[in-house]
UniProtKB/Swiss-Prot annotation:
SUPFAM superfamilies per UniProt: S15/NS1 RNA-binding domain
Protein family (similarity comment): Belongs to the universal ribosomal protein uS15 family.
Organism: Dechloromonas aromatica (strain RCB)
Gene name per UniProt: rpsO
Name by which UniProt lists this protein: Small ribosomal subunit protein uS15
Keywords, comma-separated and alphabetical: Ribonucleoprotein, Ribosomal protein, RNA-binding, rRNA-binding
Self-association state and partner proteins as the record states: Part of the 30S ribosomal subunit. Forms a bridge to the 50S subunit in the 70S ribosome, contacting the 23S rRNA.
Pfam families, per the entry: Ribosomal_S15
Signal peptide: none
CC annotations in GO: cytosolic small ribosomal subunit
GO MF, one annotated term: structural constituent of ribosome
Described function: One of the primary rRNA binding proteins, it binds directly to 16S rRNA where it helps nucleate assembly of the platform of the 30S subunit by binding and bridging several RNA helices of the 16S rRNA.
Swiss-Prot/TrEMBL GO biological process terms: translation
C-alpha cells in the first residue's frame, strides 16, 4: 500500500533538518525505507510477483546510493540515521 499524505508529512517532520526540508538525504532515505517496509509484506504473500520485486530492488538501490552519499559527506549524520531507522550496520 502506498504511503498516505499524513504518513509522509509525519516522516518529513521527523527527519527534516529545517522546516519545509524535503530534499535532505535523511528525509529521502526515511521515505524510501517506509515504502520498502510497506512493500515487504506483499512479497510474503505474492512470492512470484517479479515485476514488483524489480521496483523494490530499485528502491533499495536508490536508498543505498543516498546512504553512501551521506556517509561520504557526514559520517555522524549517517550513523545517526541508520540507528534511528533500524537499518543494519
Amino acid at each position: 500500500m502506498a504511503l498516505t499524505t499524513e504518513n509522509k508529512a509525519a516522516i518529513v517532520a521527523d527527519y527534516a533538518q529545517s522546516k519545509g526540508d524535503t530534499g535532505s538525504p535523511e528525509v529521502q532515505v526515511a521515505l524510501l525505507t517506509a515504502r520498502i517496509n510497506d512493500l515487504t509484506p506483499h512479497f510474503k504473500e505474492h512470492s512470484k510477483d517479479h515485476h514488483s520485486r524489480r521496483g523494490l530492488l530499485h528502491l533499495v538501490s536508490q536508498r543505498r546510493k543516498l546512504l553512501d552519499y551521506l556517509k561520504g559527506k557526514n559520517v555522524e549524520r549517517y550513523r545517526t540515521l541508520i540507528t534511528r531507522l533500524g537499518l543494519r550496520k
